[in-house]
Amino acid sequence: EYPIASYRNQFGTVFQDFQLFSETVAENIMVKRPLSGQQRKDAETALQKADMLERINDLPNKMDTLVGREFAPDGAVFSGGETQKLAIARAIAKDAPVLILDEPSSALDPIAENKMFETIFDSFRDKTVIYILHRLSSATFADRIYLLENGQIAEQGTHSELIAQNGKYADMFHKQAEKYIS
C-alpha cells in the first residue's frame, strides 16, 4: 500500500470548475506558502509557459497580488480564459508524471487553445497526459484517441486512423469542422 500523499503527488489535474484561492497569484500557482525563492521562480516559469506572465506583471503587486476581492478590494479578478491559464500554470508548476485535463480550453478562443495545447505537450513531453474534450480539433494533438460511448471504448486510434475509419469520430470531427468553414 502507498501513502495517499505519494499517490496524489503523481497526478496533476485541471478541471472545468477550477477554483482560485483568496491568496496571492504565486501561492495559487504553487499551492503553498510561504514560498521559497526557487518556488517563486518556478511559479514565474509556469506563468510564462501558460501565457499569463505578462498579465500578472501588469498587476500592482505582480505575483504578490491577492486573487479575488474577498479580502482585498483591489484584488485581481480573472476572466474564464485567464483562470484556465492559471490552472494550466499550476499543473506545469506541479510537474507530476500524469496530467489529467477535463475540458481545459472551454473558455479559450481557438488561437489561445492551440497555444495552450502546444505548451502542455512541450511541458509534458515525456509524461502521460489524459484529456477529456468535446472540441475535437484539440484531439489532433494526441498520440492516441479513445472515443467513449455509453461508458465503453467505441473507437480508438490516432486522429488520422480514426478519420480513415470513417466512423463516429470522423463524423463528429467533420460536423465540428463544418462550423468553422461555413
Each model region followed by its residue ranges:
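ABC ATPase nucleotide-binding domain helical subdomain, centered on the C-loop/LSGGQ "ABC signature"
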Residues: 8, 26-73, 117-118, 126, ...
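ABC-fold ATPase nucleotide-binding domain signature/coupling loops
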Residues: 53-86, 95, 179-182
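C-terminal portion of ABC ATPase nucleotide-binding domains
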Residues: 61-62, 118, 140-182
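Hydrophobic anchor residue at the start of the ABC signature
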Residues: 88, 116, 132
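A residue-level structural signal marking coil residues immediately N-terminal to beta-strands
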Residues: 96-97, 127
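Catalytic Walker B motif of ABC-type/P-loop ATPase nucleotide-binding domains
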Residues: 99-103
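Helical segment within the ABC ATPase nucleotide-binding domain
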Residues: 113-125, 137
